[in-house]
């Protein structure tokens, strides 16, 4: 995310679609400890290696881990994809120290792409992408699908909101494309009209 040891002062927005859970979490944890602010969007599209049935069995085994005398004391079993990812990152950070707690506070996680971040350029992390890290033909499942199987009730709502967001983004993109075409056309017309005068205007960057 950050080149070398330099830290980007701005908040980095990462599109988690088709990233591997563990690899994305480890890279994110490292950047948080280095002082980088990170926002992870579309957590429901994160990939887990292994089929859905296997991952669901693993999660059900995890659900059985509880405090016998008072289960509400923990461990807490998150169902939402964003909270599952947050907990994975927390496990890679010394979150009970001041440094670790400050690092974890720099992380924000969301399902879908909420309004402040839908207009910000999002990045991907090649070292965590499924297409580069998982063998072709290897089974995988999406975190959102797993969450919906174990008690998360907003899978369909997020899918609907994402469809609407993509439609709005497509309209904006088409409008931008038309404006670019008009600008290029206007520049050509201006060049034809100005002709030799361009040689005078170019050195002064007019």
Curated annotation (Swiss-Prot):
Coiled-coil positions: none
Q: Which domain of life is it from?
A: Eukaryota
Q: What are the UniProt keywords, alphabetically?
A: Ribonucleoprotein, Ribosomal protein
Against InterPro entries, the record matches this protein to: Ribosomal_uL13 (IPR005822), Ribosomal_uL13_CS (IPR023563), Ribosomal_uL13_euk/arc (IPR005755), Ribosomal_uL13_sf (IPR036899)
| One Pfam family here | Ribosomal_L13
Single GO term (MF): mRNA binding
Protein's GO biological process: translation
Can you supply one Gene Ontology CC term for this chain's record? cytosolic large ribosomal subunit
UniProt cross-references to PANTHER family, sorted A to Z: LARGE RIBOSOMAL SUBUNIT PROTEIN UL13W (PTHR11545:SF37), RIBOSOMAL PROTEIN L13 (PTHR11545)
Q: Name the family.
A: Belongs to the universal ribosomal protein uL13 family.
Full protein name: Large ribosomal subunit protein uL13w
Name its species.
Arabidopsis thaliana
Per the UniProt record, the lineage of the source organism begins with: Eukaryota, Viridiplantae, Streptophyta, Embryophyta, Tracheophyta
